[in-house]
Amino acid sequence: RFLRGNQLDSVMNYPFANAIIDFVRTGNSDALKETVFEILENYPEKSIHLMMNHIGTHDTARILTRLSKNNDNFGDRAKQSQMKLSEEEYNFAKKRLFEAVLLQFTLPGVPSVYYGDEAGMTGGFDPFCRGYFPWGKEDKEITEFYKKLGKLRIHCKAFCGGEYVPWQLPQGVFGFERKCKSAKALTVINCSESEMSVDVPEEYKKSKSHLGKSLIGKTLTLKPHEFTLIIL
């Protein structure tokens, strides 16, 4: 009732956030597809493209910390105050983060970034998700990934109101196109534990990936937790 034109322009898209996190954790692409479908079917069309797509806020644990594990059981406050990711846990979470951010920036809606997520901040639930910004100690690889996706969103008009076209792919693989009159974009992510090959339309054959794995002919082969973003 809040999105009928006389109350709010947008709301925070927690259903997307939860489904994205579940997908990159478990590979449950069917659940993500169903969540996207429910939002597109039940929300006012004009509001869909204004939804605040986030993967972390001041009300949640930091996204890198969440993605370092398969659940949000971080213990009590005393335990969270001492919690620090090992290098192995951080790198594991970082790989998942790139997948989650790619979905955040390419699904219908507007990406809403919680300060510090683009710099690699970690932490448990409030107040441990509200630390100081790590000036001079940012994870530059993560920052550059966010910056590149931001530039691609500006460049590709299909992300700003374009049609969402889901693909039928094996469980664990999530793919879709965004289309408008002047542009098209293809996003495919493999969160399964097996290598997957996907045939793509002829129009993408000569295109290079703007982010992630490139095509070989008409075939896109993705190892576990690889992805691609192709823009026409």
Where are these regions (language model features)?
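Active-site-proximal helices and loops of the catalytic beta/alpha 8
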Residues: R1-H54, T122-K148, P201
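Aromatic/acidic polysaccharide-binding cleft in carbohydrate-active enzymes
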Residues: G5, N53-L85, V101-D139
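Aromatic-anchored helix/helix-loop segment that forms the rim or "lid"
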Residues: D30-K33, F37, N71-F98, H155
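Acidic/polar loop patches that form or flank catalytic/metal-binding clefts of enzymes
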Residues: P111-Y115, K157-E163
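Amphipathic alpha-helical
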Residues: Y146-C156
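Carbohydrate-binding surface patches
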Residues: W167-P201
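Solvent-exposed beta-hairpin/edge-strand motifs
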Residues: E202-G212
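C-terminal beta-strand-rich structural cap/linker in extracellular carbohydrate-active enzymes
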Residues: K218-L232
